[in-house]
Amino acid sequence: MFAVIKTGGKQYRVAANDVITIAKLEGEAGTAVTFGEVLLYADGEGATQVGAPTVSGISVAGEIVAQKRGPKIIAFKKRRRQNSRRKRGHRQDFTVVRVTGISAA
């Protein structure tokens, strides 16, 4: 059994006990989260439901494992012969989530 969910502008194929890294969600480690935007649902017996755009009555439950930050990305801009340069660093925040189950309501 698996589902395709949409969160943070991206789509993820998830099954029970999967650990996924997604865009930052608010909450501490151990907090329960629910994903309601399910785009596709397939049970183990070959039946598949494809949403237009979402499948109603299906939700994916998960638990926040950790809040982390990605590697530092350096943006460097230089104008030659002008003694002008700018350096900026950026670290993207993301959330690690463990999928606890897929439920049909």
Curated annotation (Swiss-Prot):
The keyword Phosphoprotein is assigned to this record: no
Keyword NAD in record: no
GO CC terms: cytoplasm; ribonucleoprotein complex; ribosome
Record GO biological process: translation
Pfam families per record: Ribosomal_L21p
Keywords: Ribonucleoprotein, Ribosomal protein, RNA-binding, rRNA-binding
Alphabetized InterPro entries for the sequence: bL21-like, bL21-like_sf, Ribosomal_bL21
GO MF, one example: rRNA binding
Entry function: This protein binds to 23S rRNA in the presence of protein L20.
Similarity-based family: Belongs to the bacterial ribosomal protein bL21 family.
NCBIfam families: L21
Oligomeric form and interacting partners: Part of the 50S ribosomal subunit. Contacts protein L20.
Protein name: Large ribosomal subunit protein bL21
